[in-house]
């Protein structure tokens, strides 16, 4: 089994190749260059360095959201184009699931938090000590609502994601549970985690075609919200 994984849901751009249960290579950047400029060159480079043949791929894994609307569209379009050209399926991997999987083996709750602006986060709650168990499905909620939920669960929590620097002060002031912030090598999206989960899903037959794949946004875009607000104002 050989899978190419693409992660473009945030500022991070990451690609990886997994052969059976080995990550052959991973290329990750966390830098302000648009994914339209980075993803395909990164794929070309990783394929070249690994002396890989794209025709040997069994599937394309895509980090499918939530996250940056532009990034998700670029990741999806890139993956769909490759899958269609190679006539292979796509494995859709929820971004929050893959982020939680970074901390596989953690004894406690894992809580990815992606900054969704307006004091909201894209988040979910997981247990990953052995398998990946979903305690709270991925959603877009206020940081206040998330911390209240975690206070109710009253378990140790590991936070992961770009929401940490945004909401660290709020968490420290309002959390009534023990918590940690993930270290640098775990605290952002990684295509290696997308690939690893994709291998599990692929083995279970959880695939879709290029035509069927759509990102999960979890909420409308800012442009759509602003348009709705303008229309609402006109109606009043």
Regions found by a protein language model. Name each.
Residues 48-55, 84-94, 206:
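Phosphate-handling active-site elements
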Residues 180-236:
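Acyltransferase
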Residues 16, 122-126, 216:
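Conserved hydrophobic/aromatic positions in well-ordered beta-strands
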Residues 30-38, 69, 73, 77, ...:
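Residues at secondary-structure transition points
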Residues 1-64, 188:
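N-terminal beta-alpha supersecondary unit
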Residues 62-90, 95:
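DPxDG-like acidic metal-binding loop motif
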Residues 22, 89-188, 203, 222-223, ...:
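Surface "functional belts" at beta-alpha junctions
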């Amino acid at each position: 089994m050989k899978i190419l994984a693409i992660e473009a849901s945030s500022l991070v751009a990451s690609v990886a190749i997994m052969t059976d249960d080995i990550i052959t290579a991973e290329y990750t950047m966390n830098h302000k260059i648009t994914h339209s400029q980075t993803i395909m060159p990164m794929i070309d480079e990783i394929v070249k360095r690994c002396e890989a043949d794209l025709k040997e791929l069994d599937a394309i894994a895509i980090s499918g959201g939530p996250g940056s609307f532009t990034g998700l569209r670029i990741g999806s379009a890139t993956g769909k184009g490759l899958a269609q050209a190679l006539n292979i399926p796509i494995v859709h991997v929820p971004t929050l699931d893959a982020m939680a999987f970074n901390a596989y083996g953690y004894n406690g709750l894992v809580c990815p938090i992606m900054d969704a602006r307006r004091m909201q986060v894209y988040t979910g709650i997981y247990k990953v000590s052995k398998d990946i168990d979903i305690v709270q499905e991925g959603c877009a909620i206020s940081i206040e609502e998330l911390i209240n939920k975690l206070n109710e669960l009253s378990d140790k929590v590991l936070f992961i994601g770009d929401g940490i620097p945004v909401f660290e002060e709020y968490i420290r002031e309002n959390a009534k549970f023990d918590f940690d912030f993930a270290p640098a090598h775990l605290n952002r999206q990684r295509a290696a985690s997308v690939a690893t989960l994709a291998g599990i899903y692929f083995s279970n037959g959880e695939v879709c075609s290029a035509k069927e794949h759509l990102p999960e946004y979890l909420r409308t875009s800012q442009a759509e919200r602003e348009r709705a607000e303008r229309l609402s104002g006109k109606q009043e």
